[in-house]
């Protein structure tokens, strides 16, 4: 049995096991029912122990930790095998990523390649593996953290935005590919979220708390949605921006 009798997940895998948004989503699921949590964490991540304790306090029935280096794609099959070794995984949350300094990224080849490797290549790598596992078990929910920055890539953060555009397209397509096998994929496009990663960035309009994103993720998953914005109003903002001609778009202070 995968989900319990009322649709609550029994095992949740968080790839990016110290992600504030990812942990908030796990906490929101645990408010409904206890579950086993598997945290896939970068070796040596200083937030590892705190994340485990956070999940225990939130009501997890068990918390397992597996080492996960996003850039070491050769190790990913073993990581996913280990995560599924204890039985079916009902929900897998893809919530790892880098933000970086926008102006440095397009002028530093090493860092540009690194962020592309983490935000896009690694996301594709684990997505393929999760799809394979969940297809075999005949069920499952993947939640992929995208970004409004990928909807129309802006000059102000185009390296980061381009990686999220790629992730977004991949997971939307993966959802289409897996539909017939009983596996669902939800892509979440948040604007700015109040976390440690964005603490140094000037707060933008429509900024939301991680708890808001978590509530949206769990609710949208239960409804079988494939794509949601956080907040919902961002959808209409980006709908307008997407159709602005490039010469005009270039002059906008965004």
Curated annotation (Swiss-Prot):
Keyword NAD: yes
Record's catalysed reaction(s): trans,octa-cis-decaprenylphospho-beta-D-arabinofuranose + NAD(+) = trans,octa-cis-decaprenylphospho-beta-D-erythro-pentofuranosid-2-ulose + NADH + H(+)
InterPro entries in the cross-refs: NAD(P)-bd_dom_sf, Sc_DH/Rdtase_CS, SDR_fam
Gene3D superfamilies: NAD(P)-binding Rossmann-like Domain
UniProt GO BP: capsule polysaccharide biosynthetic process; cell wall organization
Binding-site residues for NAD(+), renumbered to this chain: 67, 164
Keyword check for Zinc: no
Gene Ontology terms for molecular function: oxidoreductase activity
Family, per entry: Belongs to the short-chain dehydrogenases/reductases (SDR) family.
Self-association and partners: Interacts with DprE1 to form an epimerase complex.
The protein's role, per its UniProt record: Component of the DprE1-DprE2 complex that catalyzes the 2-step epimerization of decaprenyl-phospho-ribose (DPR) to decaprenyl-phospho-arabinose (DPA), a key precursor that serves as the arabinose donor required for the synthesis of cell-wall arabinans. DprE1 catalyzes the first step of epimerization, namely FAD-dependent oxidation of the C2' hydroxyl of DPR to yield the keto intermediate decaprenyl-phospho-2'-keto-D-arabinose (DPX).
Protein name: Decaprenylphosphoryl-2-keto-beta-D-erythro-pentose reductase
Organism (species): Mycolicibacterium smegmatis (strain ATCC 700084 / mc(2)155)
Lineage: Bacteria, Bacillati, Actinomycetota, Actinomycetes, Mycobacteriales
Encoding gene per record: dprE2
